[in-house]
A protein has these predicted regions:
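Small-polar-interrupted transmembrane alpha-helices in polytopic inner-membrane proteins
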Residues: 21-33, 81-101
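Interfacial helix-loop-helix junctions of multi-pass membrane proteins
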Residues: 41-44, 93-118
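Alpha-helical transmembrane segments of integral membrane proteins
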Residues: 17-21, 55, 79-87, 111, ...
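"…centered on the first transmembrane helix and the immediately adjacent amphipathic helix/loop
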Residues: 2-69
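Membrane-interfacial alpha-helical segments at the cytosolic side of multi-pass membrane proteins
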Residues: 60-74, 118-131
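Short helix-capping/hinge motifs at transmembrane helix termini and TM-loop junctions
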Residues: 35-36, 72, 103-104, 131
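Functional transmembrane or membrane-interface alpha-helices that line membrane-embedded catalytic
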Residues: 82, 106-133
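Membrane-interface helix-boundary motifs at transmembrane edges
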Residues: 9-16, 71-79, 133-134
Length: 137
């Protein structure tokens, strides 16, 4: 094996390692979104103030942020940021259908999809702003 080949393998491993927090976050969000409704804690004031929407926004922002971070130095980072954002939005929509049809005592809420999309959109805005600041400097 040539040293260049080994360098490429090490580079690929190091790129993969950067995605480990994102994969863990994905697994946690999947778990949280698929908990049956009767296992969710009943907190009276959460429903009153729509705190669950803030949880959705922060959860999907974090998920997209952790997938966006490793690509920040890639040449085609703008394209990857768009792919990650669209994938996050589609994941949020898909999980609402999963909750509706496959998870007992969970409901389908369009407002949850909107909150998920807002979280992904905030991540997109944050990274685009950061990329454009570096570009103009």
């Amino acid at each position: 094996m040539t040293p260049l080949f080994l360098f490429k393998i090490n580079l690929m491993k190091s790129r993969f390692i950067l995605f480990i927090p994102a994969v863990i976050c994905f697994a946690v969000t999947f778990y949280l979104l698929t908990i049956p409704g009767n296992h969710l804690p009943k907190i009276e004031w959460v429903g009153k103030f729509q705190v669950d929407k803030l949880i959705h926004i922060s959860m999907f922002f974090t998920l997209c942020f952790l997938f966006s971070y490793p690509v920040k130095n890639w040449i085609d980072k703008y394209n990857w940021l768009l792919y990650i954002t669209i994938s996050g939005i589609l994941y949020g929509i898909a999980m609402e259908f999963v909750q509706k049809y496959f998870i007992p005592l969970r409901s389908f809420e369009i407002n949850d999809m909107i909150a998920d999309s807002i979280g992904c959109g905030i991540n997109y805005w944050w990274w685009r702003r950061k990329y454009d600041q570096v570009k103009s400097a």
